[in-house]
């Protein structure tokens, strides 16, 4: 397993994750394959699954995990390995072009990709009836694309609005 920063020895109610996927989609253009490794060290799905996240989550915790559509199956595997049960897509980020304001056009094997999803999983003991603090948090986030792997700051704000200012770890 590649070296990684040890996880803090605390207990968290929210994990906000954008795993460093070793993304190698068959059929994608040569330009699109393996772009993450140009920006940061990546990990295989098995390596991400092996991170000791289970050890730092409280009972009834929530995980918000970013994934691209072709990688959703892998993201759900990681959630399960970390002790979470997939529930839904918490957020769908529609990437906007910074300069023209229209929709950003990314790469893709089948269609030109734009949106990314932030999946939601929970651990046993999560009580939506009492833990969800706001029922007006929208799923769609329209925000500019600001560079590889940079997610909209608005996502963090929506997580706090949804679940409150609880102990959370961004990884």
Language model features with spans:
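Class I S-adenosyl-L-methionine-dependent methyltransferase catalytic core
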Residues: 1-171
